[in-house]
A protein has these predicted regions:
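Short runs of predominantly hydrophobic/aromatic residues within well-ordered alpha helices
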Residues: 6-10, 58, 102, 170, ...
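Active-site segments that bind and position negatively charged phosphate/pyrophosphate groups
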Residues: 19-146
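C-terminal charged capping/lid subdomain of soluble metabolic enzymes
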Residues: 121, 131-203
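A glycine/threonine-rich phosphate-anchoring loop and its flanking beta-alpha core
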Residues: 1-26, 123
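A short secondary-structure junction signal
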Residues: 2-3, 73, 193
Length: 203
């Protein structure tokens, strides 16, 4: 089904992002692997919904998805799985598809933690989305817009309000972060207060 294909594309893309989009540690091999995977998933993902029976598109996506979470690209690099952890509450409390929660939350994490992620965001914008104009900060901000646009083109929503979730729901959605004792993000500093603020950016 198209919905599951879109979910798989977006989930695979974000698996790579969360192992890549932190801060530079001169891990050139892992960065190159991740950038190549994101580029392939982006390019082939945009084709697959219109060409669901194209074997080559499917094969490239399946191989990219396999490499998105087979631990290779995460070796020796900081990782940020905060979108995943926060997304669990959206699925548990509102029944949203896993990939749908990620498409909503990741742009919020990128925006909220912008200073920490600016260098890698700008690099991602250049090599994945072809963004070359502007300062590093401008390219980094354009990369966030490009990511959200990609998710929308895949047919996913990118705002909590589109899923019937309002500000009154945010306390309950953010509470599991502290309840589970999680300290999220590459710096292990995102608590429930910060999680709520990230979610508020996505209303």
């Amino acid at each position: 089904p198209a919905r599951q294909v879109a979910n798989g594309v977006v989930d695979s893309f974000i698996h790579v992002v969360e192992q890549y989009l932190t801060y530079p540690v001169n891990a050139k091999v892992q960065d190159a692997f991740s950038e190549g995977l994101m580029r392939v998933i982006h390019e082939e993902g945009l084709k697959v919904l219109d060409n669901p029976n194209d074997y080559d598109i499917r094969a490239n996506l399946m191989w990219a998805a396999t490499n998105a979470l087979n631990v290779w690209i995460g070796q020796g690099v900081p990782q940020d799985w905060s979108s995943h952890r926060m997304g669990y509450a959206l699925t548990a409390q509102f029944g949203l598809d896993h990939a749908q929660t990620l498409a909503i939350l990741l742009p919020g994490v990128m925006t909220y933690m912008f200073k920490e992620k600016q260098v890698k965001l700008a690099r991602m914008g250049e090599v994945v989305f072809g963004i070359t104009d502007g300062t590093e900060e401008e390219r980094a901000r354009k990369a966030i817009v490009a990511c959200e646009d990609f998710f929308r083109r895949m047919g996913l929503k990118t705002r909590l309000g589109e899923c019937g979730i309002a500000e009154k729901d945010l306390d309950a959605l953010a509470a599991p972060v502290d309840k589970q004792g999680w300290k999220l993000g590459e710096h292990h500093n995102i608590d429930s207060r910060m999680a709520r603020e990230i979610m508020a950016l996505r209303l």
